[in-house]
Amino acid sequence: EDVLGNQAPFDFDVSVKDLYSAFKTGATLVLIPRRMFSVVTELLDYLCEHRVTTLIWAVSALCLVAQFRGFTYKVPESVNKVLFSGEQMPAKFLSQWQHYLPKASFVNLYGPTEITCNCTYHVLSRERSYSGGLPIGKPFPNERVFLLDSENREITAPDVPGEICVAGSALALGYYRNPEQNQAHFVQNPLNDRYPETIYRTGDLGKYAESGELFFCGRKDFQIKHMGHRIELE
């Protein structure tokens, strides 16, 4: 039986994945006390004691364990699935997790809050070096992800940056009482002139590799991510 270890507080969108994944599958969900993410030894004790199998964590939480060399204290060997999102995963910390959990699956997730947390995923292969970075993967069911240039033309060629746009059933209705942001981000699909179809313009930039895989490559504005939180530098 799967046991999910909840990392995100309930006012953070990542918690939705823990809650509804557990409800949908009948898995057990354990609520890890917040203070334990400041005391890595206690956190690892908790994961081992509750035999947690699945982690759907922000990258910053995984980095915390690796930075403080937590696995030299204890390895939660019951963990067999690690899914992460929020920002780009540093290769040196990812390799540490993979080294100490050799049988676990690792999944890179991508997506903003506005499309219900995630819209793409990539299951990592242990036989691949990922020297060019981690792809953000392919869309989840009922989602479409594509790139638009500055003139609203779709980009399909490799190595050409464009804005990542999302369509599908998981889009939010919009921002609460913020019509200016709604007009900028929740817009009619410029590729569809046949019927109304709202897309979300993420403000993130992506590009395709020669393999056809999609990679995140920055922002079109001055927003950054730090420890999973959006920060506007303007």
Regions found by a protein language model. Name each.
Residues 1-5, 13-53, 126:
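Conserved AMP-binding/adenylation subdomain of ANL enzymes
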Residues 1-7, 140, 145:
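Conserved structural elements of the adenylate-forming
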Residues 63, 99-108, 120-234:
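AMP-dependent adenylate-forming
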Residues 3-5, 11, 17, 30, ...:
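Short, well-ordered beta-strand segments
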Residues 35, 68-69, 96, 178, ...:
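Residue-level signal for well-ordered alpha-helical positions
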Residues 8-12, 35, 113, 168:
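Conserved AMP-binding
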Residues 59-60:
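Short secondary-structure boundary segments
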Residues 19, 23-27, 52-56, 66-135, ...:
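Gly/Ser/Thr-rich phosphate-binding loop
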